[in-house]
Amino acid sequence: MGKSLNNVPQAPLDVQFNSNGMKCSAYLYRPATEATTPIIVMAHGLGGTRRMRLTAFAERFVAEGYACLVFDYRYFGDSEGQPRQLLDIKSQLEDWKAAIAYARSLDKIDPNRVVIWGTSFGGGHVLATAADDNRLAAVISQCPFTDGFSSSMAMNPITTLKLTGLALKDKIGSLFGAKPVMVPLAAPSGHTALMNAPDAYSGYLALMPSGSNIPNYVAARFVLDIIRYYPGRKTSRIQAPVLFCVCDTDSVAPSKTTLRHASHTPNHEIKHYADGHFEIYVGEAFERVVRDQIDFLKRIVPVK
């Protein structure tokens, strides 16, 4: 039997919501129904935007009857904020809270059936956010960043030293109004970048829409913050059910550390994938993970 016509995906609306005085841009997907529905709030990882394969996930979710709000963090994509490409952890966590509040305010949305979905660095953000929001119905954390120290140790020590030097230069310069010192997000092995594992550069480029000019760099000062960010340590406080989608050969967010933090989550499920950090967004790997996520959603937050 085919899908109900009520769940035929509709073209998303381009919407904006306020986060600490600035506007965040988002796609709002709604299933074609008059019924009140759950909503999935979604955002990307390290320097990622809503256009980098998140729409593929949202289209599959809305086809199953879920509304989706897919947003860009401040300073990235179509959202406001200067300087551009400023990756600030505190700001991004504020954006998550603002996005959830906006989602709860929408008509035909059940404010008590809000799911948050994050991937990579965003996969860590949803864990930190859920620890502080007991109203959330569920969490999906995909190939999540959970531990700054472990992720830093996965990097070549020489690269770490170079990045630290650039970060200090950027941070000091920012105090005197200098332009940001930028570092690449992804680069081939041997090059200085936040991600330079063998699969990083080609995998990152595969997320880019055809013909796009999404910047592949961020302000270097972020390096000074990442090692002090441990969203995985908050998992014991999360009350909502959490689905962890773990890439067993993850070169960016070590799976062993993710599994350790996941084990402390009171209500959790773990799905393993024999894929790398970037493979999970495309092809058969994407099909496997999105199928598992839909199964989780249907069981935990069913569409009425």
Model regions: which residues?
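N-terminal cap/lid segment of alpha/beta-hydrolase-fold proteins
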Residues: 2-35
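The serine-hydrolase catalytic nucleophile loop
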Residues: 47-59, 73, 256
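Catalytic nucleophile-loop/oxyanion-hole region of alpha/beta-hydrolase
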Residues: 50, 76-111, 115, 283-289
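Conserved alpha/beta-hydrolase
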Residues: 60-80
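Alpha/beta-hydrolase-fold enzymes
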Residues: 127-207
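Short beta-strand/loop motif that positions the catalytic acidic residue
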Residues: 238, 244-246
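Conserved alpha/beta-hydrolase "acid-adjacent" motif
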Residues: 251-257
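Catalytic active-site module of serine/aspartate enzymes centered on a nucleophile-bearing elbow/loop
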Residues: 273-304
